[in-house]
């Protein structure tokens, strides 16, 4: 029998934030750590997860586990960019994602860059609007990627040919 870890391709794991959080109890404060992690295969699959534990490595491990359970598939054009422009919104965080021509690279800030690189997107333009909270920005980016549609899917939904959609 093949172990799941061996069968799966090597995953890209990026820690976006680590925070120390406190629970106030009768005797004082109980501290623990919260980690936000992005996991992807570099070929169009990406997921995010949060983990919390009393030790940082344990919080990261839990976050990675959680991220692997919340993977989504991103439609890519030529395996390098997204099919169309989209605005991802989560809370007060907004992320504008635009397809880019070959050789442009990933033009993105911290949390957005982590998600896009883990997904394997090589050419894209982004602008982070609204809140700069890393958690909201990561979720807004994921929401934008989740909302992407391929031309074939749109054509099928509308009962038209791809040429009719593109022109």
Swiss-Prot record:
Part of the 30S ribosomal subunit. Contacts proteins S4 and S8. The lineage of its organism: Bacteria, Bacillati, Bacillota, Clostridia, Eubacteriales. Belongs to the universal ribosomal protein uS5 family. The N-terminal domain interacts with the head of the 30S subunit; the C-terminal domain interacts with the body and contacts protein S4. The interaction surface between S4 and S5 is involved in control of translational fidelity. Keywords: Ribonucleoprotein, Ribosomal protein, RNA-binding, rRNA-binding. This is Small ribosomal subunit protein uS5. It comes from the Bacteria. SUPFAM superfamilies: dsRNA-binding domain-like (SSF54768), Ribosomal protein S5 domain 2-like (SSF54211).
